[in-house]
Amino acid sequence: MNRIIKKVVSILGSLVLSSVFLNSEDFYSFTNNNYFRYYFGSINVSPDIKDKIPSVNAVKADVRYSFAVGDFSKIKDYSFSYLNNLVVDAINASVSSIDCVIYSINMKDIPDALIAARDRGVKIRVIIDNDHVYPKPDTQIKRLINAGNGIEVRTLKGTRNYGVTHNKITIHDKSIVTTGSYNWTFQATFSNYENMIVLKDRKYVDGYIKYFEWMWVKARKISDGPSPILPEGYYGTPPQSTDYIYYNGYNFPLYLFSPGSQTENKIAEMIDKAKTSVDAVTFTFSSKPIADAIIRAYKRGVNVRFLEDIDMAKSSSMAKMLYEEGVPFKWMGGRDSKGAMHNKFIIIDSKILATGSFNFTTNASVNSFENVVLTDNSTVVNAYLTKFNWFYSQATSPQSANEFDGVSNLSSETKDYLGDISNFDSEKEID
């Protein structure tokens, strides 16, 4: 009888201890171990326990999407330099998935980080501009294409002859987004002036996830070969922002995705709502709606400052028009002789920032895959304003309209799509 009682007590004790262990962090760490997964992967863990099991280095689970999320607390909210390190840090912190859309790659550190992430079980999807894969990809693009299981690469081409996939987006564990002007290249890293913003608010992240999925289903597998030339409007309308920043009687969308969102017209509308100031910088400039809005703002007494890359501006009829209308206009290059002023952002009334991959061109609005994100986060807006102030203090003003000497040498068609199809300086990265 005593033996039976001892047995019952022993069983009850084991059950209590097991219950404690199953609800402890030690159990989550144990079940997260790769060896546990390999040898005991067929064990059915109850949903209430399974949902709490994070992946390696994970700190929380997103219940809405039921996936593990890495610790991104050390990833800065924005940056203007060492942008390759920011992307690598975000990749290294990822534990479940990484989705990327990129225009150009020739540096190895980000591909290295993506391959290492794949090797630890992270699912990688990459969309690359069609014309950077065909007819011959760069070595680093080829590495990703040939990386094997766990990294899937697709290509995407804009419409007409001029459209490109110009986004520079990464999405990590469906939890944070990086975007901005930064391509994964030597020039962008060491010679250009660039920016990157990091989005952690769910409203932004969800929008970018939808945009990526929208692009992914339209992108071509490598086995499908290069894309043919496609007509304007072929892709339809991308996901639209359903949340807004209300300011000056206007609903500023949280984001704008191209092609198909009339982005240049909506940016012009935003400029029309400015009451005190418009500070704008772009790499290339051919959008008449934006140029007209800038001139209207200046003529109604708004404090306008416009900045463009010097080589691109000299061949821009819209830049020349601003100058001739008296709009305060400056130009500058990059960090060195090979570099560019590659930023593309606008600050309205020192309150609203719009930044992303979108150059102020009709092509970017109509034919290319682009993104613009808007925020009224005062810390971020002020950081960009401080950076713009520094840029503007370092830039110079044209001495006469004659300095826009590249304009007269361009065909009208090239003027419309300036910067997206013509390389005026073989040493300078275009777009």
Enumerate the language-model features and the residues they cover:
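Classical Sec-dependent N-terminal signal peptides that target proteins to the secretory pathway
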Residues: 2-25
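N- and C-terminal low-complexity/disordered segments
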Residues: 12, 418, 428-431
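HKD-type phospholipase D/PLD-like phosphodiesterase module
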Residues: 27-94, 104-272, 300-388, 403-404, ...
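Glycine- and other small-residue-rich loops at beta-strand/loop junctions that grip anionic moieties
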Residues: 102-103, 282-283
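Secreted/periplasmic proteins that engage bacterial cell-wall peptidoglycan
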Residues: 106, 110, 286, 290-293
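Charged phosphate-binding loop/patch that engages nucleotide di/tri-phosphates or the phosphate backbone
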Residues: 219-225, 394-413
